[in-house]
Amino acid sequence: MAELILFNKPFQVLSQFTDDRPQNRRVTLAEWINKPGFYPAGRLDYDSEGLLLLTDCGSLQHRIASPQNKIPKTYWVQVEGEIPDSAIEQLCNGVKLKDGLTRPAKAHRMAQPTVWPRTPPVRYRESIPTSWLELTITEGRNRQVRRMTAAMGYPTLRLIRYRVGGWTLDNLLPGEFTLNQVNLPDSPQPGVARSGRTKTHSRKANRRPKQP
């Protein structure tokens, strides 16, 4: 039985335990997680927030992170502007990027989710409204979600990963994680056993994410 960490990665934290920069080093996972032998299963950009999975099992790591398995990943995306039905439809059908057409996705507008305030806060332009959408993709190109919305003319302001496969961000605040037991024959579905939530940092918001 493998172990899997579900971690709510805060904004501006690297999805790795070390920073290769000789100067101006960035915050890494080592500031939050002290579990020898655990490594990220996939990645989440420095300027994105939300669910990051880590495991001590190479087989499980491969099953989660391999593009061949096409595990769906769901994001809550705040964009600049009021995104129309035509843009939603194109996100679903595929968006032409420099590295090719994206796979079909699932996308729909959503109400603003009940989540923690970001630190530092998002910079808004007062004269321009914003929209939230839920976007589910099955591939992991570099900065894909941001490039998809930008190609539609709606830059991403805030990006939160809510779900990877059957695992979700529910009940986790930024910097918190849970340690789960996973039966490999059942993965990438959620584990059958789970420990209590572990606080790893005191700088938390006072509201938990809820599925809209």
Residue ranges and their predicted role:
Residues 1-189, 210-212:
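RNA pseudouridine synthases
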Residues 191-212:
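Intrinsically disordered, Lys/Arg-rich low-complexity segments
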